[in-house]
């Protein structure tokens, strides 16, 4: 999406030295997407999808895979030194190897005006901890979170108040954020900056019955 707006961007991750890994690299090259994807001695990441008796899907994110083990290479260090905006999540930090790489990348980025370190929380299964979340809050200056994740975070950190906006103001101030983006599904989205909040309704889009 960023590259489609004309910006010089990279996808950073890791794949295995296997058929799935080769397929991913081939697709990225065919689409001419710039990437920094290392091949490592772990299987390419997969998600196992099963359906319950009512047809509701259940997702199992496999562990011990390539993207759990993204190395911090010299090439990645050079990329960090020239990066002005980065987006990272919590799921990719479930393993200490990729977590250390993400943190080193963030710490290596130059401290310049307009720099963006966007933490897009993605709480999946039990792949998150208070420690990892707290570190990420301190390292980011923009936080993107949905309403369900905000409830979970508030419970974990003991933030008071019932109103979701109150909790957003607490996070914005506590971690000195430039911006907090709260998405609420069909109920719209909010953008918080120091002293200002704006709201955007969710567009009404006709969805075909499949």
Stretches with model-predicted labels:
Residues 1-5:
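Beta-barrel outer-membrane channel/assembly domains of diderm bacteria
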Residues 8-90, 107, 111-115:
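Conserved N-terminal subdomain of the carbohydrate kinase-like
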Residues 11-13, 119, 182:
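Structural beta-sheet core signal
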Residues 27-30, 52-56, 135-137, 160-163, ...:
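Short, hinge-like loop/turn segments at secondary-structure boundaries
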Residues 70, 153-155, 207-210:
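Short, charged, surface-exposed secondary-structure boundary motifs
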Residues 78-79, 135-136, 173:
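Structural alpha-helical scaffold elements that stabilize or flank donor/cofactor-binding regions
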Residues 85, 89-170, 187-189:
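Conserved beta-alpha-beta core of the PfkB/ribokinase-like small-molecule kinase fold
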Residues 161-210:
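Conserved phosphate-binding/catalytic region of the ribokinase-like
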């Amino acid at each position: 999406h960023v590259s489609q707006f004309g910006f010089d961007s990279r996808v950073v991750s890791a794949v295995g030295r296997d058929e799935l890994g080769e397929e991913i690299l081939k697709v990225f090259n065919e689409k001419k997407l710039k990437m920094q994807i290392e091949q490592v001695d772990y299987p390419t990441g997969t998600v196992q999808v099963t359906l319950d008796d009512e047809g509701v899907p259940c997702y199992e994110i496999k562990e011990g895979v390539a993207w759990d083990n993204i190395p911090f290479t010299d090439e990645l260090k050079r990329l960090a030194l020239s990066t002005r905006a980065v987006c990272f999540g919590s799921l990719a930090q479930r393993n200490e190897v990729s977590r250390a790489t993400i943190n080193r990348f963030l710490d290596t980025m130059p401290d310049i005006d307009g720099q963006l370190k966007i933490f897009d929380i993605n709480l999946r299964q039990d792949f998150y901890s208070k420690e990892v979340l707290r570190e990420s809050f301190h390292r980011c200056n923009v936080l993107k979170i949905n309403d369900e994740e905000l409830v979970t975070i508030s419970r974990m950190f003991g933030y008071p108040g019932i109103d979701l906006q109150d909790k957003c103001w607490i996070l914005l101030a506590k971690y000195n954020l430039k911006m907090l983006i709260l998405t609420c599904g069909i109920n719209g989205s909010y953008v918080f900056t120091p002293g200002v909040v704006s709201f955007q309704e969710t567009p009404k889009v006709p969805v075909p019955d499949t």
